[in-house]
């Protein structure tokens, strides 16, 4: 008993100090972490102790977000500029337990959720997880909705792929590893339907980087903006693509219980335009849209050019009127509002880029589910004016005296800017290039003052038709007949893409309505034809060409070039200029001549295309006739194989190069490469089986007769003729030796043997010409001495003699 008492007393004595410490600890004031209030928006944003948090509403879980990352500022000589797109993704948040996951939605399949196959589609389209974070806390807003707080500092202060510069761009910039310690989040702003994250990112530069920043410091720093934009809860009704009308597209595989094959669906990209007054719209009245399309002008744009950029935007209203809308599109100055950001994905902006690149471009970002265009940031390079000066002087200098000076007046340059603005805005509205539009105009109409001023020289501003180079000085054609404009095709294309069908129950019903409209329109006039992007060997759909006959149009073009080449020293004179301006202007003349050559050469092996639906009669593909191909080859003989001495005979040309022909050999090379390529000979052969085809042996014989006429005449060969003859021999040898077995091989061989026979029989008193012929014979013997090699062979011998 006594023992127990002693032990109990000892226990009490030992516990007393511990209890005292506990009471003392409890008596201290309790510290609770107080965070700054969150800023409300798409995601509420909170900043605390150098960390950023997103509060993600329960209602946004699973909702698709368009996430665009753009450059804000870039290093000197980067070749990319503030406002340009670096990355675009569709992401969504997913909650599992106490973790929040960010997934990328790779939208390549579509199915009706009520179909049984929807489960199979889901099981074969697992979306990748790109980020996860523990839910830091859960809060409730004033409406009772739950918001999950997650730290996102690591999401943005890293080089995560969905926000990163892609590998091609990194290679172009010469940058390598991301340097986290030299990177940071600048700020995060949040708005009702979007959240904007601005970061500063530093990368180690590669050893051979061309960027001055990388060369000087080993580092390259860029400022980036990532926009999270909530995609519409109610997707827009999509419009099915039709190859007879030129729109950009979104694509996906469509699965359905009621199909016997998977459909690769293409839907066109376009803004969501809905009439404010449906009943008035049905009555055929022009109606304003519920939401106007608005483009803001970058405040960095020189003030004198802003009105012309705006006019180029608003010129599209005439096309939207064809679709039943008025005041559908507008251009506005950027407001003096600190809450607005040029990188904000809610706003479409014409960004003015301080670049020496002579160009402009018109991209857009669209909802991959439907093609709905959400925004656009047009890239307008400052030096596009150099390109406009070059085009206009060399194409219109003979018919517009305003073009006859080294620097245009502001009104002329402004109107040129206006036309390019309209072209680029056309792209942002969803329209592709229509390189076939100019072929709807007969060449002689391009010289008809009354006709061309009323109708324009091309049916579409989306063509690369530039200016009316066919018009001659005596035609007295004004700017209206020289400049492109929003024209018949453009109005039709906007009507097709933006016409609202209030009574159509679904996209399929709209497709059938539009098909009938398209058939009727194409019957009405060839001016509504869409010719594609000019990459399919169709002579009617080429870049930089005019009219329905390349030989006639080029004849008129050359007549003007012969005048211009004499005048460019006078038109481009600048005191103290060391012929820099003169050489640049001369190169533009040569380049224009090269375009005329290519326009004609495309006829050889060319094939017209005209897409048709099942209801339309006729063929889709029609090879160019034998007569037209022979006429094209004869034209090339007259204008290329026979040296265009007028290009090099002006005295000033010897100020530009010690051998004037060096300045124009490129014209010959381009044409000969086209005429003697394996592809051209192959297509001539395959098309020859069609009615009225150009037989390949006839083609090769004609070509050899033209190029090697000197072997019969006995004349001394010029530097120009030698160059072309060597090029033909080298190319035919290549077509026979290097390419895989195909139609071109026997005809390339036949061509070499024809040339060999001519050279062996040739008689000339000129020793230099005899030496040249002997060299060509040796090159042919070398080329034919071995067996033909298959594509990919390690043998690299090129019997080009050059």
Describe each model-derived feature in a short phrase.
Residues 21-301, 319, 328, 334-387, ...:
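Auxiliary tRNA-acceptor-end handling modules of aminoacyl-tRNA synthetases
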Residues 305-312, 413, 417, 421, ...:
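Stable alpha-helical elements in mature extracytoplasmic
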Residues 314-325, 426-427, 431, 467, ...:
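Sec-exported extracytoplasmic/periplasmic mature domains
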Residues 361, 366, 372-380, 421-429, ...:
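Extended catalytic-interface subdomain
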Residues 438-802:
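Conserved catalytic/binding loops enriched for acidic/polar residues
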């Amino acid at each position: 008993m006594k023992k127990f008492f002693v032990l109990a007393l000892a226990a009490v004595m030992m516990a007393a100090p511990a209890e005292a410490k506990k009471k003392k600890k409890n008596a201290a004031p309790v510290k609770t972490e107080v965070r700054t209030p969150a800023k409300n928006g798409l995601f509420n944003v909170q900043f605390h102790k150098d960390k950023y948090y997103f509060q993600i509403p329960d209602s946004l879980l699973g909702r698709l977000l368009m996430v665009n990352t753009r450059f804000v500022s870039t290093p000197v000589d980067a070749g990319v500029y503030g406002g340009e797109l670096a990355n675009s993704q569709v992401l969504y948040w997913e909650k599992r337990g106490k973790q929040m996951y960010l997934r990328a939605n790779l939208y390549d399949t579509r199915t009706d959720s009520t179909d049984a196959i929807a489960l199979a589609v889901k099981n074969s389209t697992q979306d990748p997880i790109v980020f996860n974070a523990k839910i830091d806390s859960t809060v409730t807003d004033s409406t009772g909705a739950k918001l999950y707080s997650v730290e996102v500092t690591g999401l943005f202060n890293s080089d995560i792929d969905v926000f990163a510069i892609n590998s091609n761009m990194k290679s172009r910039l010469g940058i390598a590893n991301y340097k986290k310690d030299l990177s940071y989040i600048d700020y995060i702003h949040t708005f009702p339907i979007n959240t904007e994250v601005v970061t500063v990112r530093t990368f180690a530069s590669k050893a051979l980087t061309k960027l001055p920043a990388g060369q000087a410091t080993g580092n390259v720093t860029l400022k980036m903006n990532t926009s999270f934009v909530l995609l519409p809860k109610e997707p827009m009704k999509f419009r099915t693509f039709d190859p007879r009308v030129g729109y950009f597209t979104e694509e996906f595989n469509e699965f359905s219980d009621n199909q016997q094959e998977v459909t690769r669906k293409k839907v066109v990209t376009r803004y969501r335009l809905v009439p404010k007054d449906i009943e008035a719209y049905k009555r055929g009245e022009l109606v304003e849209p519920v939401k106007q399309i608005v483009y803001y002008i970058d405040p960095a744009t020189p003030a004198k050019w802003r009105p012309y950029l705006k006019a180029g935007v608003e010129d599209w209203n005439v096309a939207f009127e064809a679709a039943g809308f008025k005041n559908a599109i507008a251009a506005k100055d950027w407001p003096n509002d600190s809450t607005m950001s040029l990188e904000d994905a809610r706003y479409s902006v014409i960004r003015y880029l301080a670049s020496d690149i002579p160009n402009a471009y018109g991209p857009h970002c669209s909802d991959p589910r439907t093609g709905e265009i959400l925004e656009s940031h047009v890239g307008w390079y400052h030096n596009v004016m150099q390109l406009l000066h070059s085009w206009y002087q060399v194409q219109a200098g003979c018919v517009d005296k305003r073009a006859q000076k080294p620097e245009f007046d502001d009104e002329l340059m402004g109107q040129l800017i206006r036309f390019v603005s309209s072209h680029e805005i056309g792209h942002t509205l969803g329209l592709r290039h229509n390189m076939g539009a100019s072929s709807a105009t007969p060449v002689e109409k391009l010289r008809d003052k009354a006709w061309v001023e009323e109708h324009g020289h091309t049916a579409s501003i989306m063509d690369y038709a530039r200016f009316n180079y066919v018009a001659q000085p005596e035609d007295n054609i004004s700017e209206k007949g020289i400049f492109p404009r929003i024209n018949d095709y453009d109005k039709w294309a906007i009507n097709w893409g933006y016409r609202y069908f209030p009574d159509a129950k679904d996209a399929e019903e709209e497709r059938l309505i539009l098909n009938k409209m398209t058939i009727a329109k194409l019957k009405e006039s060839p001016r509504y034809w869409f010719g594609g992007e000019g990459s399919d060997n169709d002579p009617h759909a080429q870049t930089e060409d005019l009219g329905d006959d390349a030989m006639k149009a080029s004849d008129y073009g050359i007549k003007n070039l012969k005048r211009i080449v004499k005048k460019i020293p006078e038109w481009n004179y600048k005191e103290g200029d060391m012929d820099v301006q003169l050489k640049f202007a001369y190169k533009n003349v040569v380049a224009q001549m090269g375009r005329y050559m290519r326009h004609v050469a495309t006829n050889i092996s060319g094939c017209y295309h005209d897409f048709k639906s099942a209801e339309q009669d006729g063929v889709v593909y029609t090879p160019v006739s034998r007569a037209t191909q022979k006429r094209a080859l004869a034209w090339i003989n007259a204008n290329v194989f026979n040296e265009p001495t007028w290009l090099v005979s002006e005295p000033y040309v010897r100020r530009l190069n010690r051998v004037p022909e060096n300045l124009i050999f490129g014209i010959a090379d381009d044409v000969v490469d086209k005429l003697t390529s394996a592809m051209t000979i192959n297509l001539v052969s395959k098309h020859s089986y069609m009615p009225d085809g150009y037989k390949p042996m006839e083609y090769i014989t004609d070509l050899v007769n033209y190029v090697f006429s000197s072997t019969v005449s006995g004349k001394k060969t010029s530097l120009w003729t030698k160059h072309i003859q060597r090029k033909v021999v080298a190319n035919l040898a290549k077509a026979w030796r290097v390419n895989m077995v195909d139609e071109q091989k026997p005809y390339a061989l036949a061509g070499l043997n024809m040339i060999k026979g001519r050279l062996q029989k040739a008689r000339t008193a000129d020793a230099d010409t005899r030496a040249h012929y002997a060299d060509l014979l040796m090159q042919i013997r070398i080329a034919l001495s071995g067996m033909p090699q298959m594509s990919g062979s390690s043998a690299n011998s090129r019997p080009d003699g050059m």
